[in-house]
Structure formats: C-alpha cells, structure tokens
Regions:
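Phosphate-rich ligand and nucleic-acid binding surfaces
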Residues: 1-332
C-alpha cells in the first residue's frame, strides 16, 4: 500500500510576497535551492496540545506555534525549515553567501560564534542572520512581538553543513538532516505544508506567491535492471510483476524496454544509486524471512601445510620443550 501524504491546500491573502522580500543565492555551490514564503498578521503563541505531544514524542521541545510548525514539518517530511522575523531583516533581503572574514553571529542558544570564510550563512543586507543549515541567529528570532514571518526552506551542500557544525561545535536536528543530503524537490511543498498548518490554527494569513531560487535542479536517477539479475543477486524467484508492484509502493516508477526494466528513483531516495539498491528494496518488502538460506556455490579444497611452516613449528616445539620461553610480539 502506498503512503498517503497530507493534502496541502492554502488560501492565499491579498498581500503579495513580490516586492516585499528579495532572495539571492551568491554561492550556488553550497546552496542549490532557496525557497521562501511570507506570513502576515501572525499571532505567536503556544501550539495546539496535539502538536506539542507529537513533538515531545519525537524528542523535540515545543517553543511556540511558528517554531513548532517548522519542526513538525521537518519530522513529517524530513526537510528542515527556518523562520525569520521579517521586520528584523535589514533591507528585507535574504542572501545565501559565505561568511565574511572576521564575521560573527550570536546564534539562538545565545552564544556568539566566530565564522570563517568557508561557512555558508543566510544574511540580510547588513549582517549574517543564520548559520545556514545549522542554527538561526538571535537577531532575527521569532518572538511574541513578531507579526510578519518569513519561512525558509533550502537545499544546502551536506558536506559544508557537516564541516561548519563541527568547526563551531554545534549540531542541531536540522544539521543532522542536511549532512545526509535532502530532497531539493520537496522544498516548496514543505513550505506550503507549514503555511497550511499555521493557517488552519488561525494564527496567520499567507501572502500570495512563493520566492523560489532553484539554480541546480536535482537530477532524476534511472537504474536499469532485470528481474533475473535481481533474483540471481538475492537467490530468489520473485516474478517481474511482483518486483514492479513492490517498487511502486515505495514511490519508484518502473519503465519496461524489451527485457530491461528501468526504475525511476524518487527524488527523496538519494541513497538509491545502483542495481543492488533496487534488489535491497525488493528483498526488504518481499521479506527476508521468505528468502531461503543457501550455501555458497564454490569449490573449496582442503589446504596443505607448507614445508617451511612445518619446520618452523617443529623448531618452536623442540625449543619450548627444552625450557625456553616464546614471546609473540606485534608484527608492526
């Protein structure tokens, strides 16, 4: 059975995001996509009990409705979001760039951190407002006085986020996900889901439009395989139809060309890159308990003791019987 994802529908208001917020990607190597939505007439307060309860069960501490929704969507879709107080952004601008020499930022944990020039930050027109993918800045934090919010959902280079977090001695729920790589295609959908939840709570109005800078679209991967090759790999006898059905439940689309099958890998499965990965997915759903254990097919001959080894063992035995002690040391 295919997973049922939440249906996302938003009622956009009369105000438009166009002309009120500018987004720029200065470093496309470290930021492949940056999407933003704007919420106005925001009422910051506590989130509903059901959301707080679910967050706690996931090990996340509830803070306020805006932050809780971003964390909830992160758990729901696996894609981190971040919220800014729009009125605290100088120039009403967000720029994905590398930190400047000597630049500092005070993060949400109230610690001032020294940045280096190889770290990616999200900055406004004057200063860094967020350590990209790691933690937001205190200066742009959403508080009870906030009335207009900018929601961010972006795709950052995983290795860069990992190095930044390690250098700063800082690791967050967001950075742990960015480090492994994320589905760039899910950015706008995640933004819309967050806006929908806040709107359903009656805590905001949603500005019309989305700013979406997508400089490096995610490549769609296709993996060729045959049912025979997968069965040989697994030691099974699963029909081609069953394989196609199993892959379909996992979000893979399968195309047939002559006797070769081509699996179109879902964008969120960045771990699936070659035929053995397809075989693993088939085996996982088919059931490991349904795969019979078999002995490896190989001709193994009994080894013979070499002459030099026999002489060495004999000499060792003679010397030890004569009262000598043998010391076995490391080989390096």
């Amino acid at each position: 059975q295919e997973a049922k994802l939440p249906q996302v529908e938003i009622q956009e208001g009369s105000e438009k995001i166009e002309g009120k917020l500018k987004v720029t990607i200065d470093d496309s190597e470290l930021c492949a996509r940056y999407a933003a939505r704007m919420l106005y007439n925001v009422k910051v307060g506590t989130s509903p009990f059901w959301m707080q309860q679910r967050l706690r069960k996931a090990g996340v501490r509830p803070i306020n409705n805006v932050v809780d929704v971003t964390n909830y969507v992160m758990i729901e879709f696996g894609i981190p979001l971040h919220a800014y107080d729009y009125d605290k952004l100088a120039g009403h601008e967000l720029i994905a760039r590398r930190a400047k020499k000597g630049e500092k930022i005070t993060t949400l944990d109230q610690v001032e951190r020294q940045l280096t020039e190889n770290m990616l930050v999200i900055a406004d027109a004057e200063k860094a407002s967020c350590v990209a993918g790691v933690m937001g800045g205190l200066d742009s934090e959403v508080t009870e006085e906030t009335t207009t919010v900018v929601l961010e959902c972006a795709s950052f280079k995983g290795s860069s986020i990992r190095k930044t977090g390690r250098a700063l001695g800082l690791r967050s729920e967001a950075s742990a996900r960015f480090e492994r790589g994320l589905d760039s295609e899910g950015c706008v959908h995640s933004l819309n889901r967050a806006a929908q939840l806040l709107q359903q709570m009656g805590d905001c109005e949603v500005a019309a439009g989305v700013i979406d800078e997508y400089v490096h679209p995610q490549e769609v991967r296709r993996i060729d395989f045959t049912s025979q090759r997968v069965n040989d790999f697994l030691g099974t006898d699963i029909s081609e139809e069953d394989m196609i059905s199993i892959l379909a439940t996992l979000g893979f689309k399968t195309e047939t060309h002559d006797e070769v099958l081509t699996a179109v890998v879902p964008t969120w499965r960045i771990d699936c890159t070659e035929m053995p990965d397809i075989a693993e997915e088939v085996a996982r759903i088919y059931g490991y308990e349904n795969i019979q254990s078999t002995r490896p097919l190989s001709n193994i001959s009994e080894g013979q003791e070499g002459f030099e080894h026999a002489v060495r063992e004999h000499i060792s035995s003679v010397l030890s019987r004569s009262g000598l002690n043998e010391t076995v040391t490391f080989s390096f």
